Amino acid sequence: MTYQPKSDFMRVMMERGFLADCTDYQGLDEAMSKGVVPTYIGYDATAASLHVGHLLNIMMLRWLQKTGHKPITLMGGGTTKVGDPSFRSDERPLLGAEQIDANIAGMKQVFSSYLTYGDGPTDALMLNNAEWLDGLNYLEFLRDVGRHFSVNRMLSFESVKSRLDREQSLSFLEFNYMILQAYDFMELNRRYGCRLQMGGSDQWGNIVNGIDLTRRILDQEVYGLTSPLLTTSDGRKMGKSQGGAIWLNGDMLSPYEFWQFWRNTTDADVGRFLKLYTELPLEECDRLGALAGSEINDAKIILANAVTALLHGPEAAQAAEATAREVFEKGGAGEDLPTLTLTTDEIGDGISVVQLITRSGLAKSGKEAKRLIAENGAKLDDAPLTDAGLMIDADRLAAPIKLSAGRKRHALIKRAD
């Protein structure tokens, strides 16, 4: 794309690789060059924490605020009750109100690490769409809002079409999600002057619906901007690892494990991830991404430290690096490693290493743990673990032991005092 942006925000989006598509590049850029543009991203409360897959859009909101605009983080207290069908192969399980509220409380912990909330013109707002969705009158909603939507057009969106092409059913409940998200954009424009919705490229159809509805009912010019759906260079979906989701909440994934995820970045992804997930200057990102051989490991440590410091703070990043050095360079058992603490009742007369490997998260099942041992991939206190029938008693746990799966995944096992 040859367009040269006027606004700092659009320049950052283009230069650092955040931009997949925009409904009106020049119109949005012009608006952002003239004043504050309130902008929202919606987050449905499907889990108690956001994960690394959400981090790209969170960084977009951070850059938005840093370049003089107002971020709105919209919690989906209402839309979560319906479930977004975009590019899913099945219907989302429906959550109860208590679970949704608990998930929202967990999700909120992350945003204050990246955004400044308050009452100022560029201070972030945190809202919940249950505020306007829960009280809707269904018949009035159909008459006033539903009449503006063409079913033919909704069926043409790739997010819906791909599901129907696979002959997988799409419930009427899910089909309504697109209308509710469009209504969110209109309400945010009406109440808070919101002029831009951002999201992943899988949200394009939902965003366009919101733009059309806002124009039709409020006669307001609003915009949409999407980010690419990231995969790693080896084709894995961003935000997943062999051990499961990479959660952003520290109580669901320790800062050390989060740091280690970034330290294990594939060589080919380092430069790109530095641009997207850190605030290092572009020239430095390019320099670090071009390193080769053993030097690329220094770039990975810089990446891990920068990303972890943004989320968990500089001290947590430094502690994670120190733990990693102790574990990998000195063979120690760093205190910040993921830790499983067992009571004497849980240990009983002894607990098997297979159970310990599974319960510590180093394997997803007993079968996987046994295979890990059989293939010489497990270690106990840095010594090869070859006996899947080995039992660990309470005396052995008087001091912590370290279990390892491969070279990069470790956990401490401790006895409760």
Swiss-Prot record:
Record: residues binding L-tyrosine: Y40, Y177, Q181
S4 RNA-binding domain sequence ranges: 351-414
Keyword line: Aminoacyl-tRNA synthetase, ATP-binding, Cytoplasm, Ligase, Nucleotide-binding, Protein biosynthesis, RNA-binding
Location of the motif 'KMSKS' region: 237-241
Pfam families found in the cross-reference section: tRNA-synt_1b (PF00579)
Predominant localisation class: cytoplasm
Superkingdom of source: Bacteria
Family, as annotated: Belongs to the class-I aminoacyl-tRNA synthetase family. TyrS type 1 subfamily.
Function: Catalyzes the attachment of tyrosine to tRNA(Tyr) in a two-step reaction: tyrosine is first activated by ATP to form Tyr-AMP and then transferred to the acceptor end of tRNA(Tyr).
Name this polypeptide is given: Tyrosine--tRNA ligase
Protein source organism: Dinoroseobacter shibae (strain DSM 16493 / NCIMB 14021 / DFL 12)
